[in-house]
Amino acid sequence: MAHKKAGGSSRNGRDSAGRRLGVKRFGGEQVLSGNIIIRQRGTKYHPGANVGLGKDHTIFATADGTVKFHTGLKGRTFVSIVPGADEAVPAVAAE
C-alpha cells in the first residue's frame, strides 16, 4: 500500500509592517504650528519650549519657528521650537 507522509507546516512566514517612527523634522528646519517633529514609543526625546507631547508620545510644534535639539538634566534630549523672524520674501528694491 503506497503512502505519502503529510507535509509539515511552517511556523514562520509572518511579519508586521514597520511603524514609521523616527524624527520627521530635523534640527534647524522651519516648522509650522501643528507639524509633527518626532514619532516615538516612550519618551526618548522630551518636549521643550513651544512643543507638545501627544498621548502616543508624538512630539509636535505648538508655535512656528526653528527646531532645536538640546541636552538637559540627566542626559535627556529635549526638542524645542525657537520662534524667530520668519524668512519672508525679500522686498524688491525700488528703482
Curated annotation (Swiss-Prot):
GO terms for molecular function: structural constituent of ribosome. The keyword tRNA processing does not apply. It comes from the Bacteria. Transmembrane segments: none annotated. Residues 1-22 are annotated as: Disordered. GO terms for cellular component: cytosolic large ribosomal subunit. PROSITE patterns: RIBOSOMAL_L27. GO terms for biological process: translation. Keywords: Ribonucleoprotein, Ribosomal protein. Belongs to the bacterial ribosomal protein bL27 family. This is Large ribosomal subunit protein bL27. It comes from Rhodospirillum centenum (strain ATCC 51521 / SW).
